[in-house]
A protein has these predicted regions:
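Flexible, surface-exposed loop regions and adjacent strand-edge segments
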Residues: 68-71, 121-126, 182-184, 238-241, ...
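Outer-membrane beta-barrel and related beta-rich outer-membrane complex signature
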Residues: 63-67, 116-122, 178, 235, ...
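Beta-barrel outer-membrane channel/assembly domains of diderm bacteria
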Residues: 1-104, 128-168, 173, 202-206, ...
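Internal alpha/beta core interface subdomains
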Residues: 123-128, 176-194
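Surface-exposed extracellular loop regions of Gram-negative outer-membrane beta-barrel proteins
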Residues: 61-63, 110-124, 311-319
Length: 342
């Protein structure tokens, strides 16, 4: 059993960004210092299985870096909840099959991107959008009750292999206000669908994800698809592209992602790229989400003088309503990670 803690402090601001997320506002654009603390518990009964629980606390608000689903500036480490400690992960994973080629995941608090392979070697740990590989519709980090299964071709470690992932997560209206899937009207300690919806009701925020991928020795590619119902949402969408689906709406999201990295760390960077398209159907009233698309390209270097450290640069566009006459924002980030101790 292992208990791992992680404390994050973030100093920053978005000039001209309002407290309600509206740009060009007179207020809400000042510099702030926020914090987040995570405690991860990992335990195993057989050495091959995993029971994971995570507690979090923080003081972020929804904007400009926090938990709103339609927040393009959202950071990865942005727990809110007024420094209250809450449980936001609880699931169990175990292998199946003679060669452990299947892995089953089941739990009350699990996220689809953590039980699915996102083919990317760009890891900045800064802007949330780039952690989805540019496909925030398929890999939307839905959090709630769920089940998933993974099959990986049973070959020797490091050999090219096929990978298939299937999972379903319920992330409806009862998600935790402290969690980064809360869409409003939520309360600490709850997640997923409540008893008024049930886990299989179309209004409970169903996220059904399927993926087929291939892992080469130094490259990988995957095609993904997600079906979403009322209360599910595209991650970090711009404006109405990121709000939860209204009653009667459905979302069919598709994505293609891939990466390549050199065999040895040096001046040649690894490259990761992804594209996603989200088709929203069904009648609703405004402000309902619309069909959207997103993409990203990320480069990451491991310096030849110190392979434990890394630098990276990424560019992309978050999910923006397809054909919309409004702005089509671009996101750019650069980072350098330095390990200060061993």
């Amino acid at each position: 059993t292992t208990l791992k803690g992680e404390a994050t402090f973030i100093l920053g601001g978005v000039p001209g960004y309002g407290a309600n997320g509206a740009p060009n506002s007179k207020g809400g654009g000042q510099t702030t210092l926020n914090d987040e603390l995570r405690l991860n518990l990992y335990t195993s009964f057989s050495g091959k299985d995993l029971l994971r629980a995570r507690w979090g606390a923080g003081n972020f608000s929804s904007y400009p870096f926090g938990t709103s689903s339609s927040n393009i500036f959202k950071l990865i480490h942005t727990e809110n909840g007024n420094e209250q400690v809450f449980l936001d992960r609880l699931y169990y994973q175990f292998p199946i099959g003679e060669h452990n080629q299947f892995k089953l995941s089941i739990g009350a608090l699990m996220r689809n991107n953590e039980i699915t392979w996102i083919p990317s070697v760009y890891h900045s740990d800064v802007l949330d959008f780039f952690s989805t590989g540019g496909s925030s519709g398929v890999y939307n980090k839905a959090l709630g009750e769920g089940v998933g299964i993974r099959w990986k071709q049973p070959l020797r470690a490091g050999k090219p292999a096929w990978v298939v992932n299937l999972n379903a997560i319920v992330s409806g209206s009862a998600v935790s206000s402290g969690s980064d899937s809360c869409t409003g009207g939520c309360s600490n300690g709850a997640s997923g669908a409540d008893s008024s919806d049930g886990i299989l009701n179309a209004g409970s925020g169903i996220n059904a994800l399927a993926q087929v991928g291939y892992q080469g020795e130094n490259w990988g590619v995957a095609v993904g698809y997600r079906f979403g119902t009322t209360q599910s949402a595209v991650r970090t969408g711009n404006g109405v592209a990121g709000v939860p689906l209204a009653t009667g709406q459905q979302d069919n999201s598709v994505a293609i992602n891939g990466y390549w990295h050199p065999h040895h760390a040096g001046w040649i960077p690894s490259i990761s790229s992804g594209f996603g398209y989200n088709i929203v159907s069904g009648s609703s009233t405004a402000p309902a989400p619309q069909s959207s698309r997103s993409w990203m390209v990320g480069l990451q270097w491991s310096p030849p003088w110190e392979t434990a450290h890394a630098a990276g640069l990424a560019i992309g566009q978050p999910a923006n309503a397809a054909g919309a006459t409004g702005s089509s924002p671009w996101l750019v980030e650069g980072f350098y990670g330095y390990q200060v101790s061993n």
